[in-house]
């Protein structure tokens, strides 16, 4: 290798049978370990079953002619297009600098190509659209068909971050997969030039702990076990120790190679093979390798959440999703929450979680398309329905995700929630949300040790009526509690009267759910007038005479109903189920 090669990773994504592997083969000059459908199962079925890697080398754009560091190594990551293998695509997208979306020009956007576009928006900054199989278009109408599909793709990309992305026509394998190799691919030289113009040399950071995403593991007789993958962070040198966290095993690096060339060190972004001894390759097909004790294994996590707009249906608390985190996809149960309503407009914090703040429990993720229209007599939306008061959306939302089995992952890693159990043949997006893992809960007993410190609350509202006045500072209330309710639990809580006074629940009154309310500031004359009813009793002369109700007779209702409102917070993870009111 003359000078150091600068490595960039280009993802080749698209719908099944769009010609991704043929395109990667046409572009490549050097085949990596797993490239070009080497898996027998994959060759038999004609689809890419796992991440295939290959590369080609071109002069570094802008480099001085003849300089020792003039080579740009473009590593192609051929992701499978088969719908049931979307887990693998998600794992691959996390190591991609630029994405090539391969479209069958005769079919246009299909279900998996749309999902790949969604993943690209989450995990990638740049896109090139490749219209493949142009050789299948009738020669006389070819350019018109290419122009028509180009316009369609431009319209598709209009509302994405990839608006204005370049679109190029090619024929990676003229005549189809069974055709002889005699006919040369079309448009590949132009595609390489386009990629060179689009690739910006990523800034690689050698600092931080070593972390590598491993996609294949195999043994070489007399050498040891080789793990191939892409370095996500940090650096590695010969003789360093690495941990395979899923197995809790630490091994020493015996040798390293980049595309069959021995190297002594490698850094973030490099495609690498690491050789270790006395390790069974069957124990690790895909996963993570890291500096010892640099990753954490978590049973639950606090994550930031952003809904994917193409996902139909709500994101509901207590729902289960397939959660892709690190290199694993596991089932997880979600609980959504947002800032307190007065903090909805605060600037989002993307790299940490503040346990000192209070958060509002949501029955579902809040988004504008889930906002209800106001109903008559309902001033505020029902928090249970997962809608914000007044239709106002918070700028940031979070979720507690509880995993069905522990996962090993880096801190602040990408998280994607999806519904991979949905019918793969329907034309719907199965990717539901994405976010960042802000805090992992490593303690198996996190429910007792951590969750009580997470101040997520529900707002509770109870409504009742004032039955009558006892004196200037006391009234009797009813219809707030059931007969069997232990009113003692509510003693000391404040209630608001519709006449404006504030009262405090003092004690139970009888056995029927009624209660006594103390009014510290006393009742106003207007309130007393409303609450003190009068009866008319006929005198002997037949004239109406006002009297007070006699003791023992049924008490009449106040002149007009006076309502009581009891509002309090109940913290979701408070084991004592306390009711809290703000001063």
Swiss-Prot record:
Sequence ranges assigned to domain tr-type G in this UniProt record: 5-203
EC numbers, comma separated: 3.6.5.-
Pfam families, per the entry: eEFSec_4th, euk_SelB_III, GTP_EFTU, GTP_EFTU_D2
Cofactors, names only: Mg(2+); Mn(2+)
Keywords linked to the UniProt accession: Cytoplasm, GTP-binding, Hydrolase, Magnesium, Metal-binding, Methylation, Nucleotide-binding, Nucleus, Phosphoprotein, Protein biosynthesis
Keyword Transmembrane helix appears in the UniProt entry: no
Positions of the UniProt region annotated as Disordered: 371-390, 528-562
Modified residues (Phosphoserine): 524
G5: region residues: 171-173
Domain of life the protein comes from: Eukaryota
Stretches the record annotates as G4: 132-135
UniProt record similarity statement: Belongs to the TRAFAC class translation factor GTPase superfamily. Classic translation factor GTPase family. SelB subfamily.
Name assigned to this protein: Selenocysteine-specific elongation factor
Organism: Mus musculus
């Amino acid at each position: 290798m003359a000078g150091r090669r600068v490595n960039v990773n280009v993802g080749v994504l698209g719908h099944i049978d769009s010609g991704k592997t043929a395109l990667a083969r046409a572009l490549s000059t050097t085949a990596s370990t797993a490239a070009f459908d080497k898996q027998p199962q994959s060759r038999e079925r004609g689809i890419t079953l796992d991440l295939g890697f290959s590369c080609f080398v071109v002069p570094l754009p802008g480099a001085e002619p003849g300089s020792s560091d003039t080579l740009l190594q473009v590593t192609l990551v051929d992701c499978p297009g088969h719908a049931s293998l979307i887990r693998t695509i998600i794992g691959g997208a996390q190591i991609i600098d630029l994405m090539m979306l391969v479209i069958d020009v005769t079919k246009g956007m299909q279900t998996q190509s749309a999902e790949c576009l969604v993943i690209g928006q989450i995990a990638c900054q740049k896109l090139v659209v490749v219209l493949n199989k142009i050789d299948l278009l009738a020669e006389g109408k070819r350019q018109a068909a290419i122009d028509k599909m180009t316009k369609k793709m431009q319209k598709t990309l209009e509302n994405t971050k990839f608006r204005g992305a370049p679109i190029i026509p090619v024929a990676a394998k003229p005549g189809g997969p069974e055709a002889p190799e005699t006919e040369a691919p079309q448009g590949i030289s132009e595609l390489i030039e386009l990629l060179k113009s689009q690739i910006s040399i990523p800034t690689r950071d050698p600092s931080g702990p070593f972390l590598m995403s491993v996609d294949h593991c195999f043994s070489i007789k007399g050498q040891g076990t080789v793990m191939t993958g892409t370095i996500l962070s940090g650096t590695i040198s010969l003789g360093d120790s690495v941990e395979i966290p899923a197995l809790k095993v630490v091994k020493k690096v015996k040798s390293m190679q980049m595309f069959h060339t021995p190297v002594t060190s490698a850094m973030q972004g490099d495609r690498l093979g690491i050789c270790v001894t006395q390790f069974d390759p069957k124990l690790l097909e895909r996963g993570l390798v890291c500096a010892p004790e640099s990753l954490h294994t978590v049973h639950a996590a606090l994550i930031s959440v952003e809904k994917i707009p193409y996902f139909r249906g709500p994101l509901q608390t207590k729902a289960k999703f397939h959660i892709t985190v690190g290199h694993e996809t596991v089932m997880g149960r979600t609980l959504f929450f947002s800032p307190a309503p007065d903090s909805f407009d605060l600037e989002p914090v993307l790299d940490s979680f503040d346990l000192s703040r209070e958060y509002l429990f949501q029955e579902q993720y809040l988004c504008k398309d889930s906002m209800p229209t106001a109903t008559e007599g309902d001033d505020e939306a029902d928090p249970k329905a997962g809608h914000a008061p007044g239709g106002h959306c918070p700028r940031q939302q979070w979720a507690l995700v509880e995993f069905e089995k522990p996962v090993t992952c880096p801190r602040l890693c990408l998280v994607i929630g999806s519904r991979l159990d949905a019918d793969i043949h329907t034309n719907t997006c199965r990717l539901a949300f994405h976010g960042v893992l802000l805090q992992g809960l490593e303690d198996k007993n996190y429910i007792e040790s951590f969750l009580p410190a997470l101040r997520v609350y529900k707002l509770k509202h109870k409504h009742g009526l004032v039955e009558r006045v006892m004196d200037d500072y006391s009234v009797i209330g009813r219809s707030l509690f059931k007969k069997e309710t232990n009113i003692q639990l509510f003693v000391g809580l404040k209630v608001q009267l519709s006449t404006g006074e504030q009262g405090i629940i003092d004690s139970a009154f009888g056995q029927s759910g009624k209660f006594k309310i103390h009014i510290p500031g006393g009742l106003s004359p207007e309130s007393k007038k409303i609450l003190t009813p009068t009866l008319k009793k006929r005198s002997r002369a037949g004239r109406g005479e006002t009297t007070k109700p006699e003791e023992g007779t049924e008490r009449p209702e106040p002149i007009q109903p006076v309502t009581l409102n009891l509002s309090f917070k109940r913290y979701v993870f408070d084991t004592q189920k306390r009711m809290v009111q703000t001063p």
